[in-house]
């Protein structure tokens, strides 16, 4: 499995379907994502790998805050026709 940490993904199932999220960490069958608004870095959302579609964009999660995360996702969403 390729490393998904830091990758922007699109949710394909659930209440957040269609939203962009950032993978903070991953294991064999799940990813833990945040968007800085509904799901903050302090309370990550556990999603199945089957329910997310990865993009080619990877961001640095080292010094990430909820505010920076919201800004990065908004910029990506505006520039993307994904």
Regions found by a protein language model. Give the residues of each.
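Short, charged beta-turn/beta-strand-edge "cap" motif at the junction between a beta-strand
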Residues: 14-17
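Ferredoxin-like alpha/beta domains used as RNA- or RNAP-binding modules
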Residues: 1-5, 12, 22-82
């Amino acid at each position: 499995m390729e490393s998904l940490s830091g990758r922007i993904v699109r949710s394909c199932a659930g209440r957040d379907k269609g939203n962009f999220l950032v993978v903070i960490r991953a294991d064999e069958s799940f990813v833990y994502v945040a968007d800085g608004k509904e799901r903050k870095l302090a309370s990550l959302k556990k999603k199945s790998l089957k329910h997310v579609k990865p993009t080619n964009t990877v961001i640095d999660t080292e010094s990430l805050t909820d505010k920076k995360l919201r800004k990065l996702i908004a910029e990506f969403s505006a520039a993307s026709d994904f």
